[in-house]
Amino acid sequence: MRFFTKAQVEKAVKARQVQASMGFPVSSAMQGIVDRGVNFQFTSQDIRNADIIFGSEPNSRRGTTAWRQAMTGIPIRQPDAQPQNLEVAMDIMFVNGIPFIVGVTRPLNYIMVGDLDKTYETKAPARQSKIVEKSILEMVGSLKSRNFNPILLTWDGEKAVTQCTPALQFKGLQVQQVAAGAHVSVVERVIRSIKNRFRAVLLSLPYVLTALLTVMAVLFVVRCLNMQVSATSMSGISPREAVQGLKTNGKTDFRFSFG
C-alpha cells in the first residue's frame, strides 16, 4: 500500500478539480496539457497520484463509453511573414438536436465550430445553403485574420454544401467533396471526441441543458480540445497555441469548470 503526505493529497485534489475545468480529459491527455503549459499549481505526478488516491476520473470514463515555472506575461505567436496554407475538413454535427458546423484544419488539427440556426432542418434547401455558406466564411475569415490561408475545403456529399459550392469558389475557395456517404475521417474522429467530452460534461451537471447552454457546452469542449497536444504532434504545441499563439496557462485558462 502506498501512503501520501497531506501536501500530496491536497495537490491531487487540486489536479482533480482542474480536470473538470478542462472538460474531463483522460489523465494522459491532461498530463500533456500541464507539461506544456504554464502557471499550474500541480505537476503530472500529482495527476498520477490523483488516479491512485481517487481512481480514474469517472466522468471522463463515462463520456467515452459510447463508441509548466510561472511566466509574467502571455506569450503570443508572432505571425509568419508568409501565410501558411491549410486544408480544412468540414462536416455537420448534431448535439441534442442542435446542428453545428465543424471544421478541422490540417496539418494543425485546430478545431472550429459554429452553431447553425436551430431551425436549420426545417429550412428549404436554398436557405440551408445560405446558413452553411455564412458559417464557412466566418471560419475562413477567422483563419485569414491570423495569417493562415485556407486553400482547400473538404466535405462529404452534403446537399447544402453542394448548393453553396459555386458561391465559395467565387470567393476563391476550392471545395472538394468526397462521395456521398463517405464521410471525411478526420472530422468524424473529431466529432466523436466532441460528443464524448460533451457527455462527460453533461454527466457532471445536476440539471438539464437548455439549447443555449448546449451550445455553450460544445464551445467549452472544443476550447479544451484545442489545448490538448496531439500524441502524433511533432512540434509538441497545442493547436490553440499554433493558431492563436496563446500558451496554455493554468491560472487563467482553467479557473472554473463548466456550469
Which ranges hold each PLM region?
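Terminal peptide-recognition signature
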Residues: V18, D91, L225
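Short amphipathic alpha-helical interaction elements and helix-loop-helix interfaces
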Residues: F24, S28, R36, S145, ...
